[in-house]
Amino acid sequence: MKLKLAFLAVVLSYFSHAQMLSSFEEVEKLRKENPKPVVVLFTTEWCGVCRVQKKNLSKLPQSTWDSVYFISINPEKYHKDIEFFGKKYTFVSNGTSGLHKIAYELAGGRVPAYPFWVFADENGKMLTHEGLLKEKELNSIFFNHNH
């Protein structure tokens, strides 16, 4: 875990701040106009760890959200088609529920453990992380280059 976090910190050292967005359409539009790294956080309503993760995110300074695009979605509830770095993803319903293919495919063809993070550089190179990132780990990832 520590090695993976160290690797994420190195790759994401220039991710010091993020701009929070509400849709992938907005992410793609802005990313094409002004390329920046993208951070995606997948959470669900039933995931207790996800609630802790969101609380940890809320503790980060407001300035955290300036130079990286950030979006958080529930892949069980987000039904819109998504285009992300030129690839299209759809929601797959199983009747009463379902899962968005973006989470499934970015997790390597399986249902991810939540919270599920995707870190993408401006060229679409992606790293993923499943599970809670504690406040200290978030600070290490987002602010590593400043310390």
Residue locations for each model-derived region?
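Non-catalytic, surface beta->alpha helical segment in thiol-disulfide oxidoreductase systems
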Residues: S93-H147
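Sec-dependent N-terminal signal peptides
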Residues: K4-Y14
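Thiol-based oxidoreductase modules, predominantly thioredoxin-like and allied folds used
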Residues: M20-L21, W65-S97
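Boundary at the C-terminal end of the N-terminal hydrophobic targeting segment
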Residues: S16-A18
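C-type cytochrome heme c attachment motif
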Residues: E45-V52, F116
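Short active-site neighborhood of thiol/selenol oxidoreductases, capturing the structured segment around
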Residues: E33-C47
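Typically the conserved alpha-helix immediately C-terminal to a functionally engaged Cys/Sec
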Residues: R51-W65
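Structural recognition of the beta-strand scaffold that forms the well-ordered cores
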Residues: V38-L41, F70-I73, F116-F119
